[in-house]
Amino acid sequence: APKPSSAASDVYKRQLFALCDGRHALLFGGAQDHKRAFDGDLGPNTGGMGAYSPAPVFTADLVRQADERIVQPTIQKMAEEGAPYRGVLYAGLMATEDGPKVVEFNARFGDPECQVLMMRFAGDIVPYLLGCARGDVSGLPAPAFKPQTVICVVMAAKGYPDSPLEGSIIRGADQDFGPHVQVFHAGTKRRDDGQLCASGGRVLNVCAEGDDIAQARDRAYAAIRKIDWPGGFNRSDIGWRALERG
């Protein structure tokens, strides 16, 4: 599959997440997504065709700079202006010679970034979300994550993102893929005859964990090969940036 040059890859956005209570922000891991519809980062932008975590582009120094220069000042300034923010802060970042720069903020977890983060998260998310809602995360420990890599490959309906084909039959998505794979349903429904079919653009999220990005990716694509869905498609190169970095 065609791939952008390594030089171009430095402009790709990374996602850093934080849990905020209006005054404090706890970092909640990072991920790298793939926005373009087709292999080689070609085609139209989408809601996300895949993601993985941890992302090698998130060096400890980059995370520290993003926290000190972007996340904490943003939360503090919003509180000073009488608009304290509680919830998940999604910071879409670009690495530059002058450090991380903000491309966008969202007030939510990303999709499919949330799936890979939740599979790596080693704790109970509920106390953290309650802390955000109640206005105090200061007493909570820093979120802990498993060392494994998790990758998510999105299976979308043909025609996505412009005119996704709905109603096509999906077989094999409900099978047991083993302990290292989870398939999240995003746009599926049951027909009256019980068959599973597509009911949206991004339809399935095939997620797998591994000791490294290569193993996680192999497991995800092995699971995809077991799913019979002629009406769907997926990228075959999710994780290519991490693999290039070794």
PLM features per residue range, with description:
Residues 1-8, 12:
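Single conserved hydrophobic/aromatic residue that forms the stacking wall/gate
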Residues 97, 144-147, 176-177, 196-202:
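A structural signal for short secondary-structure junctions
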Residues 188-193, 197-246:
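Generic C-terminus detector
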Residues 51-54, 152-154, 202-210:
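Short, well-ordered beta-strand elements within core beta-sheets of diverse protein domains
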Residues 38-40, 140-142, 189-196:
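Short beta-strand/turn micro-motifs at beta-sheet edges
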